């Protein structure tokens, strides 16, 4: 059994006991989170969401992804710019699919 949820502007296919990485959610590690924007579960297709359906998970970790280096160079001058970015993420383990 699987479900398709919408979170952080993305759609994810999730199953029970699966670990997913989503954008940072303001909760502490060990807390429970419930996703209510369910697009598909048990053969039911939502219009746009399935009513009375939810996916529950436990937050395992809050962290930062690997650094992405952004480099900009203008070849006709000596202008160079180098930046780094580390995206914040939340690691969630799916515990229950209801619906």
From Swiss-Prot:
InterPro entries xref list: bL21-like, bL21-like_sf, Ribosomal_bL21
Keyword Iron set for record: no
Pfam families tied to this protein: Ribosomal_L21p
Keywords tagged on the record: Ribonucleoprotein, Ribosomal protein, RNA-binding, rRNA-binding
SUPFAM superfamilies noted in UniProt: L21p-like
Recorded GO CC terms: cytoplasm; ribonucleoprotein complex; ribosome
Any Gene Ontology biological process: translation
Record GO terms (molecular function): rRNA binding; structural constituent of ribosome
Record-stated family: Belongs to the bacterial ribosomal protein bL21 family.
Free-text function comment from the UniProt entry: This protein binds to 23S rRNA in the presence of protein L20.
Subunit structure, as described in the record: Part of the 50S ribosomal subunit. Contacts protein L20.
Protein name (database record): Large ribosomal subunit protein bL21
Organism: Mesomycoplasma hyopneumoniae (strain 232)
